[in-house]
Design a protein with these regions (language model features):
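C-terminal lobe and pocket-closing loops
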Residues: 269-281, 290-385
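Glycine-centered hinge/linker elements that transmit conformational signals in sensory
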Residues: 170, 213-247
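Extracytoplasmic/periplasmic solute-binding protein
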Residues: 137-144, 148, 167-219, 262
Length: 418
């Protein structure tokens, strides 16, 4: 879900470069890491300027040069599986939901940051890059967080004090004109489990449970757990009153908010420019608590060390760069800023000055990382489809039946290896 479409300003990069040089770690003796030592990193074109400066600052004290290569972001994971060892990267950038696949195939290796370094990150950010069948291990250094929030047009509504307040305002606005919609949340015929997740979590829903060891358990499916089903009648109520309508797709939702035909919009930081240039005051907050805190799904971007680094004789160096230097607050500011996202590092997060970005960061507190195990691929369609069926207006399926059927379909797909 992470979209990397914005660039870090030249001024910020320059400032970060100076800070990186000041904070560069003490170097081992030059003979231990001769100047010929090179680390190859696959990044996309948006990240390259920031990564170049970070690797240069780190490498100068270690006699290491960075070979930062632009690689088609959508092909990094698949290409890592087929690349010849001599052409393989030592480090890659990628979203946290690649981890289960890559770790299960032995393509990325665990990291062991110092306790003081890990303390600078919220637990859910570290959890996003953790994977294991018996014990969770950290397989990546998170640097950017992405999540949806509730955008409020302050000209048409006030920031809701509760879910009941939100519901009352949204429906009152809808009644003012036949062109208005209560809530601009995208679904469409294909569904959108990602944008709907705050409602799902707020009713007690979850995708997968965990083992006693804390690892994700694909056999423990929470799509139709008892608590959620107990609260599912609220979805039927929202459908009847028109608070949520699955006929609203992404384009419809965006246009309604921009044209002021919706006072509320569920969206993410990829629409930051839209919010800033809307022509009316906007505030982004977390959706108010329903029965439980309405937390969003989190998408997390990070760097991972590949198995090839050891074969290239740079395994320890790659781990030091990713598991320590890239996790420092100054590095995190540059990396997250490069694609207009909120830093994973808490210290770096405090330095964010962009008000909209900061609001999205706050809206993501306590968020749930999208499950990074392969079985998540069996969830999206059916979970999104359950919302579509239960909120399509006239003729909708009861939420209890829609989500119970979805849970069964997901379990069947997982059992068959789908």
């Amino acid at each position: 879900m992470l979209k990397m479409h914005t660039r870090l300003g030249t001024v910020l990069l320059a400032a970060v470069a100076v800070a990186l040089l000041i904070l560069a770690p003490g170097a081992p003796a030059a003979r231990d890491h001769p100047s010929a030592t090179q680390i190859t990193i696959w990044v996309d074109n948006v990240q390259k300027p920031a990564v170049d400066k970070i690797v240069d600052a780190w490498g100068r004290t270690r006699g290491v040069t960075g070979n930062v290569l632009i690689h088609d972001f959508g092909k990094i994971r698949d290409d890592l599986k087929t690349v010849k060892a001599e052409n393989a990267p030592d480090i890659i950038v990628g979203p946290h939901d690649w981890v289960g696949d890559l770790a299960a195939n032995g393509l990325v290796v665990p990291l062991f940051p110092k306790k003081a370094v890990k303390a600078q990150f919220p637990g859910y950010a570290l959890q996003s890059f953790s994977y294991g069948t018996t014990t969770n291990r950290l397989y990546g250094a998170p640097f950017a967080l992405e999540n949806v929030g509730l955008a409020v047009n302050l000209r048409l509504a006030h920031v809701p004090k509760s879910f009941a307040d939100f519901e009352k305002q949204a429906l009152a606005f809808k009644r003012k004109s036949s062109d208005n919609i209560a809530l601009a949340v995208p679904q469409g015929s294909g569904g959108d489990a990602y944008h709907m997740y705050p409602f799902f979590s707020g009713l007690g829903g979850y995708v997968f449970g965990r083992t006693k060891a804390g690892t994700l358990n694909a056999k423990k499916i929470g799509v139709a757990n008892k608590t959620f089903l107990k609260n599912a009648s609220l979805i039927d109520k929202w459908n009847r009153e028109g608070l949520i309508n699955s006929k609203v797709d992404y384009g419809t939702a965006k246009n309604a908010f921009v044209k002021q035909n919706a006072a509320f919009w569920i969206t993410g930081p990829w629409e930051a420019d839209t919010l800033k240039t809307a022509g009316f005051p906007v505030r982004v907050v977390q959706l108010p608590k329903i029965k439980f805190r309405s937390v969003p799904f989190l998408g997390v971007q990070g760097f991972m060390v590949t198995k090839f680094a050891a074969g290239h004789a740079v395994g320890s160096l790659a781990k030091d760069l990713v598991g320590d230097y890239m996790m420092k607050s100054v590095s995190q500011r540059a990396l997250a800023g490069a694609n207009g996202r909120f830093p994973a590092n808490k210290i770096a997060g405090k330095s964010v000055t962009d008000s909209i970005l900061k609001q999205f960061g706050t809206a993501g507190i306590g968020g749930v990382p999208m499950p990074n195990i392969p079985q998540m691929g069996s969830v999206w369609s059916d979970l999104g489809g359950a919302w579509v069926k239960a909120t399509k207006g006239a003729g909708a399926t009861s939420a209890r039946n829609a989500f119970t059927a979805a849970a069964r379909a997901i379990a069947s797909k997982i059992a068959s290896g789908g």
